[in-house]
């Protein structure tokens, strides 16, 4: 029992010492101008993407704004504060609506002009006709070169065929000449023998 009461008393003295130490540190920090901040796991704020890009393949890409973009946005908000036209006097009120009408008219004219130019084909580059002419001439030159190449190849093929035909005729011609020559000699020899026989045969004279 005494041991248990001693342990309880020791625990109480330790707790009292801890509270006294905590109070002392808090007092010192207050004197120095510090603030006590309780540390804990704070839930991180979920960052919302500025835009989501969808691709044809089905993939998506989220684009987040950087810190510089956020700072620029804050600067723009500071530079261009929202104006309540109901609180303006007549002069600034008319000036405000004149500027708003002018900017909206310019934006509408710009949009319509771009659409009309794209429909009429005015949005083509300034020297597009020269570019088209260059590509047309280049295409004609390529076609002409192709025709020349094909004609040269056909002419070469014709010359080769002609040379082959001439060589075949030259190899066949001497055989025909020699055979005809032999035949002519043979016929001439036969004719000569017939003439000799006629000459050697005695001619009978009638009485």
Swiss-Prot record:
Pfam families cross-referenced by the UniProt entry: FAM177 (PF14774)
Family (UniProt): Belongs to the FAM177 family.
The protein, known as: Protein FAM177A1
Source taxonomy: Eukaryota, Metazoa, Chordata, Craniata, Vertebrata
Species this chain originates from: Mus musculus (Mouse)
InterPro entries per record: FAM177
Coiled coil region boundaries: 131-170
Positions of modified residues (N-acetylmethionine): 1
Keyword vocabulary terms for this entry: Acetylation, Coiled coil, Phosphoprotein
Keyword Plastid: no
Modified residues (Phosphoserine): 65
Comp. bias intervals (Polar residues): 157-176
Modified residues (Phosphothreonine): 66
Region (Disordered): 142-176
